[in-house]
Amino acid sequence: MKRTTIAVIGVGLIGGSIALSLKRDPDIRIVGFDVRQDFLDKALNTGAIHAGTTDLQTAVREANVIFLAAPVEQIYAILESLRNLDLQPGVIVTDAGSIKTGIVNHAIRVIPDHVTFIG
């Protein structure tokens, strides 16, 4: 059986907790992304993620699921970036943002057709 790859975008408290929980499943591979190398180092050292990167394309390239766990204002920019990246067909994108209407409306406008957004 092929492992499911989940990209956790933002490995701070929320993203790190999500990653730790998901990593309990041996069939899931967690790739963490953060702009802060110290957050990635902590996530790797605590075993929350299998791999970490500061390059968004590297984080999402093989992902079956992309979990956005960044501050709301950054989620908008990340959604914009995702539309220009090489994503797996059928990839699911979801978020932990506290403001749903704005994020969902923005995702509808910018997410490519081969991507499913669950807000």
Named regions from a protein language model:
Residues 1-61:
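NAD(P)+-binding Rossmann beta1-loop-alpha1 motif at the extreme N-terminus of oxidoreductases
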Residues 9, 33, 69, 94-97:
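Structural motif
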Residues 19-20, 44-45, 78-81, 105-107:
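Short amphipathic alpha-helical segments
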Residues 39, 74, 100-103:
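Conserved short alpha-helix immediately C-terminal to the canonical SAM/SAH-binding motif I
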Residues 48-51, 69-70, 109-113:
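Short, hinge-like loop/turn segments at secondary-structure boundaries
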Residues 51, 77, 102:
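Short, conserved clusters of charged catalytic residues that mark active-site
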Residues 56-87, 91-92:
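Rossmann-like NAD(P)-binding element
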Residues 81-119:
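Rossmann-like NAD(P)(H) cofactor-binding subdomain of soluble oxidoreductases
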